[in-house]
Amino acid sequence: MAADGIDERSPLISPSSGNVTPTAPPYLQQNNLQAELPPPYTAIASPDASGVPVINCRVCQSLINLDGKLHQHVVKCTVCNEATPIKTPPLGKKYVRCPCNCLLICKDISRRIGCPRPNCRRIINLGPVMLIPEEQPAQPALPVQPEGTRVVCGHCGNTFLWMELRFNTLAKCPHCKKMNCQVPRIQGKNGSAPGKAFRSSVGSALPRRRCCTYITMGMICIFIGVGLTVGTQDFARRFHATYVSWAVAYLVGLVCLIRACYWGAIKFSYPEHSFA
């Protein structure tokens, strides 16, 4: 269950604990996310045996039998297969409930956390958590305005959060470690999704402009090198240091042409969701 050595982005209930997938319906998208604290519970008489401690599931409100599980930090509901905390998190940690009902654990100073479920992959923006006594029900965290943009990598297709709100900038994908040029997504007619014909000319202006600039600089340097080679042949026979100027001109021109090829072949990343 929850421990200090567990990855903060992994769910507290591992897939190996059961082959049944969560059946609780996902929450609707909420403006404020709730920082999970263990709810207060009391030992309630069970219909089968008296004195057996139980607790209500935080997702479906079903009763969870705590017999033999009081040493754990979280317990798994047998109805919706979601986790419910029964103890305070480890020192320096806090619980966070994703809108898809996945219970996560992260550092108490964390501002963002990603949901590891393949069908969710939300980037959760966290606010400062209010100190709440254990005898009171959990309260929602202070609202924090999300920042940044979720973009789709043009190389691997994965989504990542990019904090630069301006377009025409280079974004490095944390998954494949490749560079993308971030461009705005433009809708087609009648609100349809953009195709190749609707790619933003404003967004692609940065790589095109830099590609043309490097081509121009490369050709100028090569022409200068050719001019030096033709015009200073006799002078170079007496002063061999002239060959260095030839090599520098050709080398700079070659580097500029290589950079032009890089900017001409760079791929674009389109925003998935933008936050003001």
Swiss-Prot record:
Catalytic activity: a 1,2-diacyl-sn-glycero-3-phospho-(1D-myo-inositol-4,5-bisphosphate) + H2O = a 1,2-diacyl-sn-glycero-3-phospho-(1D-myo-inositol-5-phosphate) + phosphate
GO terms assigned for molecular function: phosphatidylinositol-4,5-bisphosphate 4-phosphatase activity
Annotated coiled-coil segments of the chain: none
A UniProt-annotated Pfam family: Tmemb_55A
Annotated keywords: Endosome, Hydrolase, Lipid metabolism, Lysosome, Membrane, Transmembrane, Transmembrane helix
Region feature Disordered, mapped onto this chain: 1-27
Subcellular localization(s) per the UniProt record: Late endosome membrane; Lysosome membrane
Membrane association type: Multi-pass membrane protein
Active site: C106
Compositional bias per record (Basic and acidic residues), positions renumbered to this chain: 1-10
Function in brief: Catalyzes the hydrolysis of phosphatidylinositol-4,5-bisphosphate (PtdIns-4,5-P2) to phosphatidylinositol-4-phosphate (PtdIns-4-P).
Descriptive protein name: Type 2 phosphatidylinositol 4,5-bisphosphate 4-phosphatase
Gene this protein is translated from: pip4p2
